[in-house]
Amino acid sequence: MAKKNIKQKKDNRIAIDVKKHIKKVDVGVFGGTFVFTSPLSIAELAPKLNKSTNEIIMRYFKKGVVYNLNTILDEEQIGELCLEYDLDFKIEKNVNTENLLENIAFDDLEADLVARAPIVTIMGHVDHGKTTLLDTIRKSSVTASEAGGITQHIGAYQILKGDKPITFIDTPGHEAFTEMRARGANLTDIVILVVAADDGIKMQTEEAIDHAKAANVPIIVFVNKMDKYEANPDKVLNQLSAKEIVAEELGGDIVFVKGSALKNEGIFELLDSILLIAELNDYKANPNRLAYGTTIEANLDKGHGPLATLLVQNGTLRKGDYLVVGSTYGKIRNMFDEYDNEIEMALPSKPVKVSGFEEVPTAGDKFLALADEKQARAIANDVKQKKIRLERSMLQSSDIRAKIANGELKNINLIIKADVQGSLEALKGIFNSINIEGVTTTLVRSAIGTISESDVRLAQTSDAIIIGFNVRANRIIKDLADSVGVQIMNYDIIYKFKEDLEAWMKGTLDPIIVEEVIGEAKVLKLFKHSQVGTICGCRVINGKIKRNALVRVLRDGIVIYNSKIATLQHNKDSVNEVIADKECGLTIANFNDVKENDIIEVYVKVEKNHDEVK
């Protein structure tokens, strides 16, 4: 039987010309403009400006600043120096395979561009209803499955309003996820700022405003929870006006939509506002090229291995494409939409879940589809080598280990395993947010996946605590950890981990010795004794006094001697303590120069942890 000829459909998508994007900047003066790439030492800068090093050093010396050949001048200083020499200046960037993905520049013709869905990021304070709003829009709910009612990682979804698609990115509201919210703002075309009408603006509201302004994107305010009795939308409008987010009804240019995500009120008006802004801004992309975009989320999936949620920002992504994503690469084996339906392709602004990577990508990494696997592997390897060099450089430049070794710092070693990259980032970010003098944390290992035998062995040798966030160790691994004395701590709520880490860090500090006054006695009469010296006849005026307790002798409010009680009697009997309003006789070790009306302050030294000391 004759074989059928199966024709492969020709792929007409444009591939990035990697060589064309590689650029090495020539540093120097060209046509009255000094072109440079980064901070330079005076020794490096002078010949490029056609000046002597002495001339530049003397310029600063005359300003009262002493520099030498090795002094590094930053970009601003170089710019100022250029202006003094009547030169314009321009900062350019060297582009190589190590930083190619962050420096892709498309030269698409206007005729090749088509309208794409707006990318909308929902931001706002924790518990103000962002996820509920997105759930209402999607007609589904994931809120109940999120521990503590806080969205633990970014989700990206595309919906239809009529026949027009809108892509939504949901960002976590908790303080630990600042980096993820910043990433969401930088990916987006429009920010939806959700503010609860019964609560007003809060910390993350202000942070979201800052991110949106930094990204220079339009803002729509959704005043949520209007169904609440305590709702006060005017308060919200006034608070936001003070932050230069002025509603149209108050003479500004910001669209405000009032409603209730829970009651499905104001949703259609919100969607219409998004589409209106999208139409005005005319968002476009070229679907006829290999895809480029950003990794939204990544995790290790039991069924599919390394899995990443990708947002296509330009081009079309197809099943079977070769991808480089940060320091990893792969060939797309499976592609799923936001509802886990397997699909063959994704157009611009489409979020998809993709499998087929060699390793779990890092959330926030750019991705690029390439014509062949060899090229993808080579670029990924170059990026990986750059990361290794940076890590080694940071380790070598840090003096933390030396301080730990000589006792200047206390240290906690941690191994963190998490279910998804976004959560891992947030946990790592907590280290930067906690600052307790004298204590540091060392992250021995951080990775996505379950807790393994190698984690336990590493924890054993490095004296580390293993943190599992939404991942667990199986019984065999738990038994191994118990047998070698390794502690495994499991979490599913980010702020619980933060609380515990703070407690551990404070717990590693040496206890603070605090003096606590337990009693006072007033000297009423003095008796001289040939063997024991001066006996003080006292009345306890406050608290109690104890034999062998530490004392301060105060005269007119001034401490004149520190010692301890040598003997203590009550009614001629030796006793261990005497309470308030009772009289006693006592002697003070090695001190006889006591006078009537002196106050004997009795105190003890107590060890306290740092939380107890205010």
Curated annotation (Swiss-Prot):
Residues 149-153 are annotated as: G2. It holds the Pfam family GTP_EFTU. The keyword GTP-binding applies. GO terms for cellular component: cytosol. GO terms for molecular function: GTP binding; GTPase activity; translation initiation factor activity. Residues 170-173 are annotated as: G3. This is Translation initiation factor IF-2. It comes from Ureaplasma urealyticum serovar 10 (strain ATCC 33699 / Western).
